[in-house]
Amino acid sequence: MAKKVFKRLEKLFSKIQNDKAYGVEQGVEVVKSLASAKFDETVEVALRLGVDPRHADQMVRGAVVLPHGTGKKVRVAVFAKDIKQDEAKNAGADVVGGDDLAEEIKNGRIDFDMVIATPDMMAVVGKVGRILGPKGLMPNPKTGTVTMDIAKAVSNAKSGQVNFRVDKKGNVHAPIGKASFPEEKIKENMLELVKTINRLKPSSAKGKYIRNATLSLTMSPSVNLDAQELMDIK
Protein backbone atom coordinates (compact mmCIF):
# COMPACT_ATOMS: atom_id res chain seq x y z
CA MET A 1 0.00 0.00 0.00
CA ALA A 2 2.75 2.45 1.03
CA LYS A 3 4.69 1.61 -2.12
CA LYS A 4 1.64 2.34 -4.27
CA VAL A 5 1.11 5.72 -2.56
CA PHE A 6 4.79 6.59 -3.01
CA LYS A 7 4.62 5.78 -6.72
CA ARG A 8 1.50 7.90 -7.11
CA LEU A 9 3.14 10.87 -5.39
CA GLU A 10 6.34 10.41 -7.38
CA LYS A 11 4.33 10.57 -10.59
CA LEU A 12 2.55 13.74 -9.44
CA PHE A 13 5.76 15.47 -8.35
CA SER A 14 7.26 14.76 -11.78
CA LYS A 15 4.65 17.08 -13.30
CA ILE A 16 5.75 20.05 -11.18
CA GLN A 17 8.81 22.27 -11.53
CA ASN A 18 9.55 22.96 -7.87
CA ASP A 19 11.86 25.87 -8.60
CA LYS A 20 9.24 27.63 -10.72
CA ALA A 21 6.57 30.13 -9.66
CA TYR A 22 3.68 29.59 -12.05
CA GLY A 23 1.38 32.29 -13.34
CA VAL A 24 -2.29 31.89 -12.45
CA GLU A 25 -3.33 30.40 -15.78
CA GLN A 26 -0.52 27.86 -15.98
CA GLY A 27 -0.75 27.07 -12.27
CA VAL A 28 -4.42 26.13 -12.62
CA GLU A 29 -3.62 24.00 -15.67
CA VAL A 30 -0.89 22.11 -13.80
CA VAL A 31 -3.01 21.58 -10.68
CA LYS A 32 -5.89 20.13 -12.70
CA SER A 33 -3.45 17.67 -14.27
CA LEU A 34 -2.61 16.39 -10.76
CA ALA A 35 -6.13 15.07 -10.06
CA SER A 36 -5.73 11.37 -9.26
CA ALA A 37 -8.10 10.56 -6.39
CA LYS A 38 -11.28 8.53 -6.74
CA PHE A 39 -13.35 11.52 -5.62
CA ASP A 40 -13.73 15.10 -6.84
CA GLU A 41 -10.86 16.81 -5.04
CA THR A 42 -11.11 20.35 -3.67
CA VAL A 43 -8.87 23.03 -5.16
CA GLU A 44 -7.30 25.16 -2.42
CA VAL A 45 -5.27 28.37 -2.42
CA ALA A 46 -2.81 29.08 0.39
CA LEU A 47 -1.34 32.55 0.81
CA ARG A 48 1.42 33.62 3.19
CA LEU A 49 0.77 37.28 3.98
CA GLY A 50 3.23 39.89 5.21
CA VAL A 51 1.21 40.71 8.31
CA ASP A 52 1.59 40.13 12.04
CA PRO A 53 -1.78 38.82 13.30
CA ARG A 54 -0.68 39.47 16.89
CA HIS A 55 -1.55 43.10 16.17
CA ALA A 56 -5.29 43.74 15.86
CA ASP A 57 -4.76 46.24 13.05
CA GLN A 58 -3.06 43.56 10.94
CA MET A 59 -5.77 40.92 11.22
CA VAL A 60 -6.97 40.06 7.73
CA ARG A 61 -10.48 38.64 7.78
CA GLY A 62 -13.35 38.73 5.34
CA ALA A 63 -15.63 36.91 2.95
CA VAL A 64 -16.04 36.58 -0.78
CA VAL A 65 -18.81 35.11 -2.92
CA LEU A 66 -17.01 33.10 -5.59
CA PRO A 67 -18.54 33.61 -9.06
CA HIS A 68 -18.72 29.85 -9.64
CA GLY A 69 -19.15 28.64 -6.06
CA THR A 70 -17.03 26.02 -4.32
CA GLY A 71 -18.75 22.94 -5.69
CA LYS A 72 -19.89 22.04 -2.19
CA LYS A 73 -23.50 22.01 -1.01
CA VAL A 74 -23.57 24.33 2.01
CA ARG A 75 -25.92 23.83 4.95
CA VAL A 76 -26.81 27.09 6.68
CA ALA A 77 -28.04 27.67 10.24
CA VAL A 78 -29.68 30.97 11.17
CA PHE A 79 -30.26 32.53 14.58
CA ALA A 80 -33.23 34.88 14.27
CA LYS A 81 -36.71 35.53 15.61
CA ASP A 82 -40.17 36.51 14.39
CA ILE A 83 -40.31 37.72 10.78
CA LYS A 84 -36.56 37.21 10.31
CA GLN A 85 -37.05 33.48 10.87
CA ASP A 86 -39.55 33.47 8.01
CA GLU A 87 -37.08 35.36 5.79
CA ALA A 88 -34.39 32.80 6.58
CA LYS A 89 -36.64 29.85 5.74
CA ASN A 90 -37.86 31.45 2.52
CA ALA A 91 -34.25 32.11 1.49
CA GLY A 92 -33.39 28.43 1.89
CA ALA A 93 -31.78 28.20 5.34
CA ASP A 94 -31.51 24.60 6.52
CA VAL A 95 -31.78 25.24 10.27
CA VAL A 96 -33.54 28.22 11.86
CA GLY A 97 -34.07 29.00 15.54
CA GLY A 98 -33.16 30.96 18.64
CA ASP A 99 -32.71 29.65 22.17
CA ASP A 100 -33.96 26.27 20.97
CA LEU A 101 -31.18 26.10 18.36
CA ALA A 102 -28.58 27.06 20.96
CA GLU A 103 -29.78 24.18 23.16
CA GLU A 104 -29.55 21.75 20.24
CA ILE A 105 -25.97 22.88 19.58
CA LYS A 106 -25.11 22.39 23.27
CA ASN A 107 -26.45 18.86 22.91
CA GLY A 108 -24.14 18.14 20.00
CA ARG A 109 -26.00 19.26 16.88
CA ILE A 110 -23.49 20.61 14.36
CA ASP A 111 -24.97 19.57 11.02
CA PHE A 112 -24.31 22.84 9.19
CA ASP A 113 -21.38 24.59 7.50
CA MET A 114 -22.17 28.25 8.17
CA VAL A 115 -23.97 30.18 10.90
CA ILE A 116 -25.74 33.50 10.32
CA ALA A 117 -27.38 35.67 12.98
CA THR A 118 -29.25 38.93 13.35
CA PRO A 119 -27.47 41.40 15.69
CA ASP A 120 -30.17 41.07 18.36
CA MET A 121 -29.51 37.31 18.58
CA MET A 122 -25.78 37.52 19.29
CA ALA A 123 -26.34 37.22 23.04
CA VAL A 124 -27.95 33.84 22.36
CA VAL A 125 -25.19 32.85 19.93
CA GLY A 126 -22.65 33.81 22.59
CA LYS A 127 -23.94 31.01 24.81
CA VAL A 128 -22.55 28.49 22.32
CA GLY A 129 -19.53 30.56 21.29
CA ARG A 130 -17.11 28.08 22.84
CA ILE A 131 -18.55 25.39 20.60
CA LEU A 132 -18.89 27.39 17.38
CA GLY A 133 -15.66 29.42 17.69
CA PRO A 134 -13.11 26.58 17.45
CA LYS A 135 -15.00 25.20 14.45
CA GLY A 136 -14.83 28.53 12.62
CA LEU A 137 -18.61 28.86 12.73
CA MET A 138 -19.02 31.96 14.91
CA PRO A 139 -20.94 34.69 13.05
CA ASN A 140 -19.02 37.92 12.47
CA PRO A 141 -19.97 41.28 10.91
CA LYS A 142 -16.74 41.24 8.83
CA THR A 143 -17.93 38.17 6.96
CA GLY A 144 -21.49 39.42 6.58
CA THR A 145 -22.83 36.70 8.86
CA VAL A 146 -24.13 39.12 11.50
CA THR A 147 -26.75 41.11 9.62
CA MET A 148 -30.38 42.16 9.40
CA ASP A 149 -30.39 41.27 5.70
CA ILE A 150 -30.87 37.58 6.39
CA ALA A 151 -32.17 36.73 2.91
CA LYS A 152 -29.05 38.11 1.23
CA ALA A 153 -26.71 36.43 3.73
CA VAL A 154 -28.34 33.03 3.22
CA SER A 155 -28.30 33.51 -0.56
CA ASN A 156 -24.58 34.38 -0.47
CA ALA A 157 -23.80 31.34 1.67
CA LYS A 158 -25.70 29.04 -0.67
CA SER A 159 -24.06 30.64 -3.73
CA GLY A 160 -20.52 29.86 -2.61
CA GLN A 161 -19.44 32.42 -0.02
CA VAL A 162 -16.02 31.64 1.40
CA ASN A 163 -15.08 33.08 4.79
CA PHE A 164 -11.37 33.47 5.45
CA ARG A 165 -9.06 34.76 8.15
CA VAL A 166 -5.32 34.87 8.59
CA ASP A 167 -3.95 32.33 11.09
CA LYS A 168 -1.29 32.93 13.76
CA LYS A 169 1.49 32.47 11.21
CA GLY A 170 0.04 34.84 8.63
CA ASN A 171 -1.46 32.16 6.36
CA VAL A 172 -4.83 32.23 4.63
CA HIS A 173 -6.31 29.00 3.24
CA ALA A 174 -9.43 28.95 1.08
CA PRO A 175 -11.24 26.49 -1.22
CA ILE A 176 -11.88 27.82 -4.73
CA GLY A 177 -13.63 24.94 -6.45
CA LYS A 178 -13.33 21.30 -7.45
CA ALA A 179 -10.92 19.45 -9.72
CA SER A 180 -13.84 18.81 -12.09
CA PHE A 181 -14.34 22.56 -12.66
CA PRO A 182 -13.19 23.94 -16.03
CA GLU A 183 -9.87 25.79 -15.77
CA GLU A 184 -11.53 29.14 -16.50
CA LYS A 185 -13.92 28.80 -13.55
CA ILE A 186 -11.13 27.92 -11.12
CA LYS A 187 -9.11 30.87 -12.41
CA GLU A 188 -12.02 33.31 -12.05
CA ASN A 189 -12.75 32.08 -8.53
CA MET A 190 -9.12 32.53 -7.54
CA LEU A 191 -8.93 36.03 -9.02
CA GLU A 192 -12.04 37.07 -7.07
CA LEU A 193 -10.59 35.70 -3.82
CA VAL A 194 -7.18 37.33 -4.28
CA LYS A 195 -8.76 40.63 -5.34
CA THR A 196 -10.75 40.67 -2.10
CA ILE A 197 -7.70 39.83 0.04
CA ASN A 198 -5.67 42.55 -1.69
CA ARG A 199 -8.40 45.09 -0.90
CA LEU A 200 -8.14 44.14 2.78
CA LYS A 201 -4.41 44.86 3.04
CA PRO A 202 -3.86 46.61 6.40
CA SER A 203 -2.33 50.08 6.10
CA SER A 204 0.12 49.11 8.85
CA ALA A 205 1.44 46.08 6.94
CA LYS A 206 5.05 46.60 5.87
CA GLY A 207 6.93 45.18 2.89
CA LYS A 208 5.61 42.60 0.49
CA TYR A 209 1.96 41.79 1.19
CA ILE A 210 1.73 38.34 -0.46
CA ARG A 211 4.99 36.61 0.45
CA ASN A 212 4.20 33.17 -0.90
CA ALA A 213 1.31 31.47 -2.68
CA THR A 214 0.47 27.88 -3.57
CA LEU A 215 -2.33 26.01 -5.28
CA SER A 216 -3.16 22.38 -4.56
CA LEU A 217 -5.76 19.62 -4.61
CA THR A 218 -6.90 17.61 -1.60
CA MET A 219 -4.51 14.75 -2.43
CA SER A 220 -1.84 16.51 -4.49
CA PRO A 221 1.47 18.28 -3.92
CA SER A 222 1.40 22.10 -3.96
CA VAL A 223 2.19 24.22 -6.99
CA ASN A 224 4.03 27.49 -6.34
CA LEU A 225 2.36 30.60 -7.75
CA ASP A 226 3.86 33.94 -8.76
CA ALA A 227 3.18 36.07 -5.66
CA GLN A 228 3.91 39.32 -7.49
CA GLU A 229 1.31 38.53 -10.15
CA LEU A 230 -1.24 37.94 -7.40
CA MET A 231 -0.40 41.23 -5.68
CA ASP A 232 -1.04 43.04 -8.96
CA ILE A 233 -4.63 41.76 -9.13
CA LYS A 234 -6.99 44.66 -8.42
From Swiss-Prot:
One of its GO terms (molecular function) is rRNA binding. PROSITE patterns: RIBOSOMAL_L1. HAMAP family: Ribosomal_uL1_B. InterPro entries: Ribosom_uL1_bac-type, Ribosomal_uL1, Ribosomal_uL1-like, Ribosomal_uL1/biogenesis, Ribosomal_uL1_3-a/b-sand, Ribosomal_uL1_CS. GO terms for biological process: regulation of translation; translation. Coiled coil: none annotated. Part of the 50S ribosomal subunit. This is Large ribosomal subunit protein uL1. The keyword Hydrolase does not apply. Belongs to the universal ribosomal protein uL1 family. Keywords: Repressor, Ribonucleoprotein, Ribosomal protein, RNA-binding, rRNA-binding, Translation regulation, tRNA-binding. Pfam families: Ribosomal_L1 (PF00687). GO terms for cellular component: cytosolic large ribosomal subunit. Binds directly to 23S rRNA. The L1 stalk is quite mobile in the ribosome, and is involved in E site tRNA release.
